[in-house]
Design a protein with these regions (language model features):
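Extracytoplasmic copper-binding redox domains, predominantly the cupredoxin/blue-copper superfamily
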Residues: 1-78
Length: 78
């Protein structure tokens, strides 16, 4: 799973198996989202502080926070 804190996704790169669900939990002081990059083919709703969002991944994908685009991460599927 991925924790959002300190204006970063932690870990920035997460290895999973195809079909695994990843939970993104916002432990930062501000709202964030999780958006596929590039292309924005999928995006979460804004994730409030102390809330989470889940997604099942079948392919490796890069993502960012569209609110704070300097924040980037990768899901790597084995």
């Amino acid at each position: 799973d991925v924790e959002i804190s300190g204006m970063k996704f932690n870990p920035e790169e997460l290895w999973i198996n195809s079909g695994d669900m990843v939970i993104f939990t916002n432990k930062d002081m501000v709202v964030h989202d999780v958006t596929q990059d590039p292309g924005k083919e999928w995006t979460s709703k804004p994730i409030p502080v102390d809330s989470s969002w889940k997604k099942v991944f079948t392919l490796s994908e890069d993502y960012l926070c569209s609110i704070h685009p300097i924040m980037k991460g990768k899901i790597k599927v084995r």
